[in-house]
């Protein structure tokens, strides 16, 4: 294997594949990246068994094809400490990977490719396309509601389903739920698989996605979730458990509601929450005519209260909520005004953008600490 490449192109790709690499004393091969040189391209692959990132580099001068695995962290550190505009000469020779840059030379240990894991997606796939913009929107609107290491494993990820010509993303930790949908175009009429993408896969995907109109392909099988970009493929195992029904929790016909300024509500909550109980982060909200009272207290007999104006209301709300949950939602809503409505059956509170039809279509539900 022998090729030449401009350092800045190699660094850009090495950074992405290194996201999956951590210290691994049991399987040292997982600290390596798979490097394949063929057909005038270089392919870099990293994996942690549960996820895989594969990047194809076209800006390369291939002199001799070949493949090997090499430490991902070491090759990245070397390249980052060399000038970005240097042309690198890379060659596999005598079981070492040789990197030459002007008068500098480095020899890295390698491992054979036969032991490098390969995530094989099954043939039974559902495929559809979506823009990077739309996919990143639904992820950023929902990911913060995923559970963290819950015993109910189906909560430790993001639920995806294709329904009524839309992609739905749903996350819940049992105390709150986030739902966002985006329209899909040119869909077949076949039934699409619903899957749960694990938390780590969701967070990694958010890093990889850009706010771009570039169309990407989503492939869903019985065991994997895969995204294909122009020169990058991200694959993740899925959680093979049933996600709970969430549709019955949503208020579809909202006649009674409260409209608040998003920024004013968020800033007041942030200040009041400073003196809330550190474990429960509880704040009380209560409206009186066109004013909303936000109060809290803690075990040290400290108290805080603020009053903000209500833009419009025809309901009475009096409940205690987790301030951090509400602030997460307010940070995600891309509208100057929010709409609060109360579900009298579940005693939950539903939050969404007031201008729902033009803002990203996301709905949030929070269970009260006590009503």
Curated annotation (Swiss-Prot):
Q: Which InterPro entries match?
A: DNA_clamp_sf, DNA_polIII_beta, DNA_polIII_beta_C, DNA_polIII_beta_cen, DNA_polIII_beta_N
State the Gene3D superfamilies in the record: 3.70.10.10, DNA Polymerase III, subunit A, domain 2
Query: Where is it chiefly localized?
Result: cytoplasm
Compartments annotated for it: namely: Cytoplasm
| Keywords, ordered alphabetically | Cytoplasm, DNA replication, DNA-binding, DNA-directed DNA polymerase, Nucleotidyltransferase, Transferase
Q: Which GO biological process categories is it annotated with?
A: DNA strand elongation involved in DNA replication
- One GO term describing the cellular component: cytoplasm
The subunit structure is: Forms a ring-shaped head-to-tail homodimer around DNA which binds and tethers DNA polymerases and other proteins to the DNA. The DNA replisome complex has a single clamp-loading complex (3 tau and 1 each of delta, delta', psi and chi subunits) which binds 3 Pol III cores (1 core on the leading strand and 2 on the lagging strand) each with a beta sliding clamp dimer. Additional proteins in the replisome are other copies of gamma, psi and chi, Ssb, DNA helicase and RNA primase.
What does the protein in this record do?
Confers DNA tethering and processivity to DNA polymerases and other proteins. Acts as a clamp, forming a ring around DNA (a reaction catalyzed by the clamp-loading complex) which diffuses in an ATP-independent manner freely and bidirectionally along dsDNA. Initially characterized for its ability to contact the catalytic subunit of DNA polymerase III (Pol III), a complex, multichain enzyme responsible for most of the replicative synthesis in bacteria; Pol III exhibits 3'-5' exonuclease proofreading activity.
Query: Hey, which family's this protein in?
Result: Belongs to the beta sliding clamp family.
What protein name is recorded for this chain? Answer: Beta sliding clamp
Q: Which organism is it from?
A: Buchnera aphidicola subsp. Baizongia pistaciae (strain Bp)
